[in-house]
A protein has these predicted regions:
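Short acidic N-proximal helix/loop "leader" segments that mark the beginning
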Residues: 3-39
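Short beta-strand/turn micro-motifs at beta-sheet edges
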Residues: 30-34, 92-99
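Core segments of cupin and vicinal oxygen chelate
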Residues: 35, 46-87, 91
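Eukaryotic phosphotyrosine signaling hubs
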Residues: 41-43, 103-108
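Vicinal oxygen chelate
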Residues: 47-54, 108-219
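Long, compositionally biased, intrinsically disordered segments
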Residues: 60, 101, 109-111
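Short glycine-biased active-site loop of nucleotidyltransferases that positions the nucleotide triphosphate
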Residues: 79-81, 97-100, 145
Length: 219
């Protein structure tokens, strides 16, 4: 059972979080399997009412420390690395407001190199009155979920487990026992980091029960 199927089954009450799970291993890459696949995930394009295009575009510039590769009346492209754009925002006439509870993309996630970078970003955005709606240590990641002006969810995260140990982590039973995670207070976590507590220790998932799914912000 894939992690996504496992999560879906848990939300539907099909299985109990009793620690039972199939053995996990990192699948071979498409290239290793002799397949031709995309070289990379290039960008995400968001559509919004024309009058909000630049507000949404500016939000992503602030959150991602991005710059506009191209900007016009209809919207623009935001980059923060060597890709010409990672986020595009386009104003479409006649677009209706976001409706909670409909099928579609849940969120887009951005990974930081270390917890200190995530902490810096949290306090930087706090000064801009941009705060996470939900903060949770999933086990594999420490994650904060934000809403953009159109209520699209954006996850800012850091990996808790080195890439080469992911398969081992999924096989040790911790994730199977709780594939959702444990909520945390970013103020508390990052102040402990500033006080000198080891990043390795702070990335460990704290003891506790997973939140009820009703606690997750709707979008």
């Amino acid at each position: 059972m894939s992690p996504s199927r496992l999560f879906w089954s848990l939300t539907k009450g099909e299985i109990e979080m009793d620690g039972s799970a199939p053995v996990a291993k990192m699948p071979k890459t498409a290239k290793e399997r002799g397949k031709i696949a995309p070289a990379k995930l290039a960008h995400v394009v968001l559509r919004t009412p024309p009058e909000r295009a630049h507000m949404v575009l500016d939000w992503y510039k602030v959150v991602l420390e991005g710059e506009a590769m191209y900007e016009a009346d209809f919207g623009g492209f935001v980059t923060y690395d060597d890709e010409h754009h990672r986020i595009a925002v386009l104003g479409f006439p006649g677009i209706k407001e976001h409706i909670d509870g409909y099928a579609g993309m849940h969120h887009v996630a951005f990974t930081y190199e270390k917890l200190a970078d995530l902490s810096h970003t949290y306090f930087r955005l706090k000064e801009e009155n941009i705060l996470p709606e939900f903060s949770i240590n999933h086990g594999p990641t420490t994650s904060m979920y934000y809403f953009d002006p159109d209520k699209n969810q954006v996850e800012l995260q850091v990996d808790n487990v080195p890439e080469e140990k992911f398969a081992e982590y999924f096989d040790n039973g911790e994730f199977s026992a709780n594939p959702i995670g444990v909520k945390f207070d970013p103020e508390d976590l990052f102040k402990r980091l500033e006080a000198g507590e080891a990043e390795e220790d702070l990335l460990q998932r704290p003891e506790g029960a997973p939140p009820d799914l009703s606690e997750f912000p709707a979008n």
